[in-house]
From Swiss-Prot:
It holds the Pfam family EF_TS. Belongs to the EF-Ts family. It comes from the Bacteria. One of its GO terms (molecular function) is translation elongation factor activity. Gene3D superfamilies: 1.10.286.20, DNA helicase RuvA subunit, C-terminal domain, Elongation factor Ts, dimerisation domain. This is Elongation factor Ts. InterPro entries: EF-Ts_dimer_sf, Transl_elong_EFTs/EF1B, Transl_elong_EFTs/EF1B_dimer, Transl_elong_Ts_CS, UBA-like_sf. Keywords: Cytoplasm, Elongation factor, Protein biosynthesis. It is found in: Cytoplasm. It comes from Chromohalobacter salexigens (strain ATCC BAA-138 / DSM 3043 / CIP 106854 / NCIMB 13768 / 1H11).
Length: 289
């Protein structure tokens, strides 16, 4: 009998929307063949949930929670198929329940956290609202000694956690708001991946005004434009959104702090969405209600 790996169970869960134990059992009975397992599941009571899981869940919401003393914070993305469901009280309550578990466990291992009670709650929600619901990802961040974590959620769709060394909760939240609005690539210029810099350098060298320039002059121009690129895409160097006369680093420093880093979630980023027109979406909602 083939060994059933955790990754195989996870894949089956993602494709069917069913519980971990049910997926493991199905894989065991199918001798590790995931397609056979899906076929068997669709022949039994898992048919309805399995069909729902085939639909793309690229809408949803982001929720956060920060410890009262600001020492750590968590953020979670939960996906639904439509924005309409993402605003439903049942969906919101489920997301809050899951983020509470993430906060309590201080763990971003969504697969493990979704075992048992939370997975049962998810399956019940799927049956109740008629859409595929997926707990996509979570993150846990901790502040250094004397530091603070800040959080900001915009419209339920963009969430940010920031970490400061020193500073205070208000400043940390302000920086999180800036990240939500401006979406910097990295916290500090030195954090920019070399591959990203190489790509930008190639773009600069291909620009018309670089043609025919002596190597020394061209290199100076490249370095100048890379410096500008880093300033525009690094959180600490950007003009602070609430006061463009100072950089984010200057704003934080004035409060006795220093930017450590940030994490930004935006609902559905990286998920390929299906194109569905509005009329069709309304008809689907009416059919499920």
């Amino acid at each position: 009998m083939a060994a059933i790996s955790a990754s195989l169970v996870k894949e089956l869960r993602e494709r069917t929307g069913l519980g971990m134990m049910e997926c493991k059992k199905a894989l065991t009975e199918a001798d590790g063949d995931i397609e056979t397992a899906i076929e068997n599941l669709r022949k039994n009571s898992g048919l309805k949930a399995a069909k729902k899981a085939e639909r793309t869940a690229a809408e949803g919401g982001v929720v956060t929670r920060v410890a009262e003393d600001g020492t750590y914070g968590v953020m979670l993305e939960v996906n639904s198929e439509t924005d309409f469901v993402a605003r439903d009280d049942n969906f919101t309550a489920f997301a809050e329940k899951v983020v509470g578990k993430v906060f309590e466990a201080k763990s971003d291992d969504v697969a493990s956290l979704m075992e048992g009670e939370l997975e049962e709650a998810r399956e019940q929600l799927v049956q109740k609202i008629g859409e595929n619901i997926s707990v996509r990802r979570a993150v846990v961040v901790e502040a250094p000694a004397g530091g603070v974590v800040g959080a900001y959620v915009h419209g339920g769709r963009i969430g940010v956690l920031t970490v400061l060394k020193g500073g205070n909760a208000e400043v940390a939240k302000d920086v999180a708001m800036h990240v939500a609005a401006i979406n910097p690539s990295v916290a500090h210029p030195e954090d920019m991946p070399q591959a990203e810099l190489d790509s930008e350098k190639a773009i600069i060298l291909a620009q018309p005004d670089m043609a025919g320039k002596p190597a020394e002059i061209a290199e100076k121009m490249v370095q100048g434009r890379l410096k500008k690129y880093l300033a525009e895409n690094s959180l600490t160097e950007q003009p602070f959104v609430k006061d463009p006369n100072q950089s984010v680093a200057e704003y934080v420093k004035a409060a006795g702090g220093e930017v450590v880093g940030f994490t930004r979630f935006e609902v559905g980023e990286g998920i390929e969405k299906e194109e569905v027109d509005f009329a069709q979406e309304v008809m689907e909602q009416a059919r499920r209600s």
